[in-house]
Amino acid sequence: MTSVEQSRQLVTEIPGPVSLELAKRLNAAVPRGVGVTLPVFVTRAAGGVIEDVDGNRLIDLGSGIAVTTIGNSSPRVVDAVRAQVADFTHTCFIITPYEEYVAVTEQLNRITPGSGEKRSVLFNSGAEAVENSIKVARSYTRKPAVVAFDHAYHGRTNLTMALTAKSMPYKSGFGPFAPEIYRAPLSYPYRDGLLNKDLATDGKLAGARAINVIEKQVGADDLAAVIIEPIQGEGGFIVPAEGFLATLLDWCRKNNVMFIADEVQTGFARTGAMFACEHDGIVPDLICTAKGIADGLPLAAVTGRAEIMNAPHVSGLGGTFGGNPVACAAALATITTIENDGLIQRAQQIERLITDRLLRLQDADDRIGDVRGRGAMIAVELVKSGTAEPDPELTEKVATAAHATGVIILTCGMFGNIIRLLPPLTISDELLAEGLDILSRILGDF
């Protein structure tokens, strides 16, 4: 089993010479459309550290975009995967089923919000889960249209690109896109507050604004679903004002519109709850999950009320690899680890550690326009000094400097001015503090 010392160590520049040679091979074999944030080639990873081919150890504050939530190569996952691979690796569940798939769906039906009878279906990726949630919603309502939100990200397939708000790099040049997609304004407290202070704090008011746009653009009679990330991911870790999600859900319930929660990035303890919609006390009709579900193995799911999930005809849902038994074994071990090791509570601790530090930084630096997020999903919105104008150039400089110092951080946001922190929940306090020290020092240097 992988054992990686939980400390940062730089023995070469980042990236090192071996990584640079491998990057040449990458560029000769992989199309340029597959962009790479930091070309250090990984050999081992565990806890909060990634080790590269040059022997450097980097602090991981990205978790592979919120995937290795319980830490890379988590012991229970390694044991479960080894055992499953030794038994069988694939049969195709829709041809000859197996217990592992059923066990995962049982667990999802148990842990997702809501106490009624539920059903779950498994896929390979978040985008595939989102696509299928729309299929289910359309099948149940017999209506075509879907509403997504400003700043949304839902994937890179044709339909999910249509749902995604940001053009470059996700959509530019790839159209035409799926029809019957409409867009509504999100509750974005930081930027809403620049225009209307009430919008920043009153989620019901922000919800009414969104509903007004929805009713004018498409109307309930043709609307199958509203899909929303309870906390936006790629859009900038935007946490809507309290009451926004509940207002939307109430409108959906009154109008036979499915409320779909895209919890691909927020699910599985990432935000200090098993699912982010729990913070708002809402129960979606359908919930999409992926990323943190299986500690790095490809798995995704759609879970929802049984009557809704049973709407598609027999063989209307499925796929060759969806619910692969090895990925299912990893998912079962992941859920056990979250629940047995107190990782929901750990995410809450990480939130306090990060936000306390970042809020102190904000007090001393007016380029930090906003600090937001929940759990181990925290963002810093960088702006030009004395303004609220996004500063993507500073954001890129900070990220590049962090990488060179051995700290993996990610950027995001419609304007490219968000530093996002997504550490694994198993990172030590000391390692997290070191990463934040480095981030603080870099901001001071610029």
UniProtKB/Swiss-Prot annotation:
It is an enzyme of class 2 (transferase). Its EC number is 2.6.1.19, 2.6.1.22. Belongs to the class-III pyridoxal-phosphate-dependent aminotransferase family. GO terms for biological process: gamma-aminobutyric acid catabolic process. The gene is gabT. The modification N6-(pyridoxal phosphate)lysine is found at K291. PROSITE patterns: AA_TRANSFER_CLASS_3. SUPFAM superfamilies: PLP-dependent transferases. Its cofactor is pyridoxal 5'-phosphate. Pfam families: Aminotran_3. Keywords: Aminotransferase, Pyridoxal phosphate, Transferase. It catalyses: 4-aminobutanoate + 2-oxoglutarate = succinate semialdehyde + L-glutamate; (S)-3-amino-2-methylpropanoate + 2-oxoglutarate = 2-methyl-3-oxopropanoate + L-glutamate. GO terms for molecular function: (S)-3-amino-2-methylpropionate transaminase activity; 4-aminobutyrate:2-oxoglutarate transaminase activity; identical protein binding; pyridoxal phosphate binding. InterPro entries: 4NH2But_aminotransferase_bac, Aminotrans_3, Aminotrans_3_PPA_site, Class-III_PLP-dep_AT, PyrdxlP-dep_Trfase, PyrdxlP-dep_Trfase_major, PyrdxlP-dep_Trfase_small. This is 4-aminobutyrate aminotransferase. Transmembrane segments: none annotated. Pathway: Amino-acid degradation; 4-aminobutanoate degradation. Gene3D superfamilies: Aspartate Aminotransferase, domain 1 (3.90.1150.10), Type I PLP-dependent aspartate aminotransferase-like (Major domain) (3.40.640.10).
